[in-house]
Structures are given as structure tokens and as C-alpha cells.
Amino acid sequence: MANNKSAKKRIQIAERNRLNNKSYKSTVRTLTKKTLENCEKYKKEPNEDNMNLVKTSLNKAFSLIDKAVKKNVLHKNNGANKKSKINKFVKTALNIK
């Protein structure tokens, strides 16, 4: 356990940051799942509304991943990998080459 005041503060800060990062990562996972679900919905029933759902959820997911990378919650390669996987799935769902 920490003995001095500054070490105790650092422990508190590390715990606070851990919880914030955990929340951020959870939100990234949730938006990724939502994007993939919307892609599946579009595959089953291709129409303009479902296309808009896919596009908006894709933009939100990419935006949040970029913000997580900027805040050092995710490593830049990890963020790029996540975006690549999502984009690959979306392109196959929308039949884009």
C-alpha cells in the first residue's frame, strides 16, 4: 500500500482513469454491435431506412473509436483494426466492392 500522500493520490487517479476507460471501451463495443445488427437488418430487408441506420451507426462507431484513440484509451493500431473489421463487415452487407 502507498505510504505517502502523492502515491495515494496517484492510486485514486489510476482507479478513476481505469473506470473511465472501461466505460469508453464498453461504449465502443456496444456501438460496434449496433452497427453489425443494423447491417444484418439491412441484409434481410434492404431499404433506404435501414441503409440510413447502418450509415449513422457506422459514423457514431468510427467517431467514438477515433476519440478513444485520441484519449489514449485504445492504441492507434487497435482502433484502426476495429474500424477495419467493422468496415469490412459493412461493405459485405451492402455489397460494396
From Swiss-Prot:
Role of this protein: Binds directly to 16S ribosomal RNA.
Coiled coil spans: none
NCBIfam families associated with the record: S20 (TIGR00029)
InterPro entries named among the record's database cross-references: Ribosomal_bS20, Ribosomal_bS20_sf
Name this polypeptide is given: Small ribosomal subunit protein bS20
GO MF term list: small ribosomal subunit rRNA binding; structural constituent of ribosome
Organism: Prochlorococcus marinus (strain MIT 9215)
GO CC aspect terms: cytosol; small ribosomal subunit
Pfam families hit by this protein: Ribosomal_S20p (PF01649)
Family of this protein: Belongs to the bacterial ribosomal protein bS20 family.
Chain's gene name: rpsT
Top-level taxon: Bacteria
GO terms classed as biological process: translation
Keywords noted in UniProt: Ribonucleoprotein, Ribosomal protein, RNA-binding, rRNA-binding
